[in-house]
């Protein structure tokens, strides 16, 4: 009877924990919003649609396909869509929700091992849920993107692997890290690096060595010939548009955002060790040692002109997982020492952190619906144009539009390729980022951008020149359009026109 009662209580507790994780996941989704097709989704969502329909993008597939050669992410999502018959929009949103749930579940598992107090565990999860769109200093990354990104899924798997290592089950972490590597190799490599330091910190002889030496050593570098090849001038031109790639050009506050968390984890290690909180102390030591090592690696990689070919690897992305742990532990400490069991403190805490992040997201995507539900008619004028193009123009249509359209007021960084599902001439923002990763695209990118120089003053003769040079037969222009174009659709801001 007592055993049955104990099992029942345990099951109810597990169910309650699951419901809390799902509840915080729903809250996180509601706060951060959902914007398919923005920013990097111009690569991933476009590739998924191309996998499902190879007839799409006959003129410009290299601007997304080449960058994704090292990942299976788009193919796996496309495979799920084929297997289930669920629409692209619905499946992508479901995967985003699943990634949020897995991320918060993994954070909860970590918090349970680091903190004995249940209120601390849930406060940590609550703060992570609220702060998913927190920028990571200097890196142009968020903890979690507002669209389905390979990094979202890989990070969730890395966090789950960390929880297994903390639980003393290192072998369970290996397949998770391998899958993460197949999804996002760079983030997985950094995750593997952290797991290595965590394993060392939990290993008693290594922990004693850390305490006595308190330093980190750089591994020897293996020379690779391609690293020292002279860079393509057009590749350098694209690279120079990304100032966040250059560590030594960061502002002082970006440096503070990089070094400050490492100092905090060093302090946490010392305090937790004095208080006898052994696991928390070792975890903090692992984060500190990992951060110091990766910071030194980044300073070497980005400090010598001869190593410029390594710049697109963006070694400062190591901060991404550090910020995850910073938010998780900050929330847990807040819950342990300040929130405690006070309902009013918890209510104020949740209101402030979620309300402020929600307001920030509404300001960032002010012209779009906060959650862009599948099948819902868009209110954004650019998305209205993309929707018309997707259903009313030939699959092989080739478009030109303002090469800086992503920065246009009310556009909110939505990708034409991903949402209109048509080919376009290279743009000056997202395609430039692609060239930094794929140098061989430099000549094509530069030629197309130069041909679009002075776009705002284009007249019919300029559009006819694009048609003759590249085969472009459609354009998206501001309404009212230049005379002579055969316009098929317009709203108050934009017109979609054929080039005669």
Sequence positions of predicted segments:
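Signature aromatic-anchored transmembrane alpha helix within multi-pass, membrane-resident enzymes
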Residues: 336-365
């Amino acid at each position: 009877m007592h055993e049955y009662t104990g099992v029942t209580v345990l099951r109810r507790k597990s169910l309650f924990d699951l419901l809390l994780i799902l509840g915080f996941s729903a809250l996180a989704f509601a706060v951060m919003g959902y914007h398919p097709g923005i920013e990097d989704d111009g690569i991933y969502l476009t590739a998924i649609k191309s996998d499902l329909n190879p007839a799409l993008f006959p003129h410009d597939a290299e601007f997304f396909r080449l960058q994704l050669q090292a990942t299976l992410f788009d193919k796996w999502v496309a495979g799920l869509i084929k297997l289930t018959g669920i629409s692209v929009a619905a499946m992508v949103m479901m995967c985003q929700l699943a990634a949020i749930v897995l991320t918060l579940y993994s954070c909860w598992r970590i918090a349970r091992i680091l903190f004995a107090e249940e209120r601390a565990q849930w406060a940590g999860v609550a703060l992570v849920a609220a702060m998913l769109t927190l920028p990571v200093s200097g890196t142009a990354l968020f903890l979690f993107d507002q669209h389905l990104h390979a990094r979202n899924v890989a990070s969730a798997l890395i966090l789950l692997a960390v929880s297994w290592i903390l639980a003393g089950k290192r072998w369970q972490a290996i397949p998770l890290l391998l899958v993460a590597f197949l999804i996002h190799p760079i983030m997985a490599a950094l995750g593997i690096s952290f797991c290595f330091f965590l394993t060392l910190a939990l290993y008693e002889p290594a922990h004693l060595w850390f305490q006595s030496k308190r330093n980190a050593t750089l591994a020897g570098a293996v020379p690779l010939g391609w690293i020292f090849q002279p860079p393509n001038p057009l590749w350098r031109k694209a690279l120079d548009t990304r100032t966040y790639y250059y560590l030594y050009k960061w502002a002082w506050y970006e440096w503070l955002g990089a070094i400050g968390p490492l100092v905090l984890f060093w302090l946490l290690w010392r305090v937790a060790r004095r208080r006898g909180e052994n696991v928390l102390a070792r975890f903090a030591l692992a984060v500190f040692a990992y951060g110091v090592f990766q910071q030194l690696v980044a300073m070497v990689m980005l400090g010598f002109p001869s190593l410029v070919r390594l710049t697109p690897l963006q070694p400062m992305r190591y901060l991404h997982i550090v910020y995850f742990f910073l938010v998780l532990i900050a929330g847990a400490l807040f819950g342990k020492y300040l929130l405690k069991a006070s309902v009013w403190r918890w209510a104020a805490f949740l209101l402030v952190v979620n309300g402020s992040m929600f307001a920030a997201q509404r300001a960032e995507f002010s012209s779009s619906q906060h959650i862009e539900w599948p099948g819902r008619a868009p209110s954004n004028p650019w998305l209205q144009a993309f929707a018309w193009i997707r259903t009313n123009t030939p699959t092989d249509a080739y478009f030109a539009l303002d090469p800086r359209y992503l920065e246009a007021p009310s556009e909110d960084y939505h990708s034409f390729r991903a949402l209109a599902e048509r080919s376009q001439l290279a743009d000056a923002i997202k395609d430039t980022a692609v060239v930094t990763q794929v140098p061989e695209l430099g000549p094509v990118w530069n030629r197309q951008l130069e041909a679009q120089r002075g776009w705002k003053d284009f007249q019919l003769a300029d559009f006819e020149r694009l048609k003759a040079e590249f085969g472009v037969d459609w354009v998206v222009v501001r309404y009212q359009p230049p005379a002579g174009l055969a316009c098929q659709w317009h709203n108050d801001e934009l017109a979609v026109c054929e080039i005669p």
